């Protein structure tokens, strides 16, 4: 996320959405009654033509929000409301409109009051955008899984199957290996141009990954500089996750916080397994610990963080963490650590002392 303009005296913040994680953050701060301005397409009815068949015309509108809808498995945020400002010639003031926000969208938010929590969320989102993403490749002589790791999630993007003949067919195998490597490299080039990853980590069993790295660095020296060697026991998505758990991509993943998320959740479960007094879970229990200043680190799953019904309690948690200098982390609910956290209610805390 990029904050393009900030004028809190007018209650105005203009920003640009850079990636999917930004959409999640945005969904947590836009509320009913906010004024949102952005460029959009609006179907305009022409004389004598059905309303649903008019021309879609680009325009800039301002709506007063009455509904925000986020599909956790979608890449779009839908913001609905009543049009308050728009081109006079179309006569659409007072009508409903829905903005569709995705990667690359720019919008202006005007609030009656920007809470400290809102600003903390924006600050965190902007900070995470600066850290970028990393591509991971788990490969062997049968196939390659390519995934993207961001600040909160790991997403499988492609699986490329090799068609290598038997090792007895030396000439045929060499030709097919070049084709296989070329397809992987072309896919990485396309992704590289789109997301500008901080690094590309390539892992897998045996020496096959080494041959690919040599090939890729020779064919594309610029992208080759971003490539690092990892280690995984297989070429599936579990191999990608294995690289993260083993710390193979740690030099970049520590920037993206994903490895820290895994470690933090594992520490919670280790304390729980020992019946330790230095851990608690559940929204109300954690909020009480935070208010007493006992919480050292608070973990909140995305499913809880972005639940409209939990907004007030979540904001109270974040404000309490700021006040008592406790660390808080948002854990992606679609990730392995997020699923584990959701299994115990989606909120947990490691404590500084017993309460």
Curated annotation (Swiss-Prot):
Query: Which proteins does it associate with, and in what oligomeric form?
Result: Monomer.
Give a short account of what the protein does.
Answer: May function in recognizing stalled ribosomes, interact with stem-loop structures in stalled mRNA molecules, and effect endonucleolytic cleavage of the mRNA. May play a role in the release non-functional ribosomes and degradation of damaged mRNAs. Has endoribonuclease activity.
One Pfam family this sequence matches: eRF1_1
What EC number(s) does this enzyme carry? 3.1.-.-
MF annotations from Gene Ontology = endonuclease activity; metal ion binding
Return the similarity comment.
Belongs to the eukaryotic release factor 1 family. Pelota subfamily.
Biological process, per Gene Ontology: nonfunctional rRNA decay; nuclear-transcribed mRNA catabolic process, no-go decay; nuclear-transcribed mRNA catabolic process, non-stop decay; ribosome disassembly; RNA surveillance
Q: What is this protein called?
A: Protein pelota homolog
Supply the domain comment: The N-terminal domain has the RNA-binding Sm fold. It harbors the endoribonuclease activity.
The protein's matches in SUPFAM superfamilies, at most eight in alphabetical order, are given as: Dom34/Pelota N-terminal domain-like, L30e-like, Translational machinery components
Please state the gene responsible for encoding this protein: pelA
**One GO CC annotation, please?**
cytoplasm
Question: Which PANTHER family does the record cross-reference, listed alphabetically?
Answer: PELOTA, PROTEIN PELOTA HOMOLOG
Location comes to: Cytoplasm
Query: Which enzyme class, named as a word?
Result: hydrolase
For this protein, the record's NCBIfam families field holds:
pelota
Organism listed in the record: Korarchaeum cryptofilum (strain OPF8)
């Amino acid at each position: 996320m990029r904050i393009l303009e900030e004028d809190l005296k007018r209650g105005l913040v203009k920003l640009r959405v850079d990636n999917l994680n930004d959409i999640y953050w945005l969904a947590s701060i836009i509320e009913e009654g906010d004024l949102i301005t952005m460029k959009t397409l609006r179907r305009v009815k022409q004389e004598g033509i059905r309303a649903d068949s008019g021309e879609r015309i680009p325009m800039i509108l301002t709506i007063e929000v009455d509904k925000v809808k986020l599909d956790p498995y979608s890449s779009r945020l839908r913001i609905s409301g009543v049009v308050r400002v728009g081109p006079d010639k179309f006569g659409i003031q007072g009508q409903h409109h829905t903005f569709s926000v995705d990667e690359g969208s720019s919008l202006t938010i005007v609030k009656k009051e920007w809470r400290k929590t809102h600003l903390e969320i924006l600050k965190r989102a902007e900070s995470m955008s600066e850290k970028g993403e990393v591509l991971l490749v788990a490969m062997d002589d049968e196939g390659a899984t390519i995934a993207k790791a961001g600040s909160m999630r790991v997403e499988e993007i492609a699986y490329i199957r090799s068609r290598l003949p038997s090792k007895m067919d030396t000439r045929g195998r060499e030709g097919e290996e070049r084709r296989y490597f070329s397809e992987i490299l072309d896919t990485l080039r396309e992704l590289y141009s789109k997301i500008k990853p901080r690094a590309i980590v390539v892992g897998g069993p045996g020496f096959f990954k080494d041959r690919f790295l040599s090939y890729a660095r020779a064919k594309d020296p610029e992208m080759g500089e971003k490539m690092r060697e990892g280690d995984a026991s297989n070429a599936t998505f579990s191999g990608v996750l294995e690289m993260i758990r083993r710390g193979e991509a740690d030099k970049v993943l520590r920037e993206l916080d994903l490895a820290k998320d895994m470690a933090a959740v594992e520490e919670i479960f280790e304390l729980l397994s020992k019946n330790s007094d230095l851990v608690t879970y559940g929204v109300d229990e954690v909020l009480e610990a935070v208010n007493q200043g006992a919480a050292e680190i608070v973990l909140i799953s995305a499913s809880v963080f972005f639940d409209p019904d939990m907004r007030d309690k979540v904001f109270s948690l974040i404000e309490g963490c700021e006040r008592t200098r406790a660390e808080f982390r948002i854990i992606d609910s679609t990730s392995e650590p997020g699923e584990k956290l959701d299994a115990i209610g989606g909120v947990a805390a490691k404590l500084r002392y017993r309460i």
